[in-house]
Amino acid sequence: MSLFPFLKLCYNTFMDIWTSLGAFAFFESERLSFRPLIFLDRFDLHEIVSNPQNLQFFFPATQTQHETDCLLVHYFMKEPLGVWAIVDKELDKMIGVVCFEKIDVQKRTAELGYFLNASYWGRGLMTEAVTCLSDLALTAMGMERIILIAHLENKASIRVAEKSGFKLVSRFKGADRYTRTMRDYLRFEKEENCE
């Protein structure tokens, strides 16, 4: 059953994918809120991205606050559509990021990427975030398929994909985008008609 049936009608009538990404710049789940990143997130982001444990499958850790500030502005704020800060509603603290990469408007697909402060691991928060965003994208944003690529050794991300309703579709080898080392990857997909 769709979580956002009235929004699907609205999307089909009025919006394209980019407009819907703008319309859903802010949304919530039970424990989390999602919003565009702002410069005031710089310290919470630095807490996350300066710790290599948080990013071992995403990108290299930053060394200084200045590097984090540059990352924040150039990677997350410069083109904000499809990029959300994950905020713990109880603490009003930015604890992670979830984003769409490789948005294909013609095929109505996007690849989902995310990371979470290690202090919040093991609580089901990333599963909640991925489920909420993927369901919203498939029911109200006009997406037909969401893709999630996980490193084979990233067991936590594989569990998030499975618990969020994604189906494993392939295993492949590829070069890590930062280290250029060959790694094994799993490709998961979630489609509009997935239950």
Predicted regions, residues:
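Conserved GNAT-fold acetyl-CoA-binding loop/helix
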Residues: 53-74
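Juxtamembrane/interface motifs at transmembrane-helix termini
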Residues: 64-68, 76-78, 89, 115-117
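A short helix-loop-beta-strand connector motif used in the catalytic cores of GNAT acetyltransferases and
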Residues: 73-85
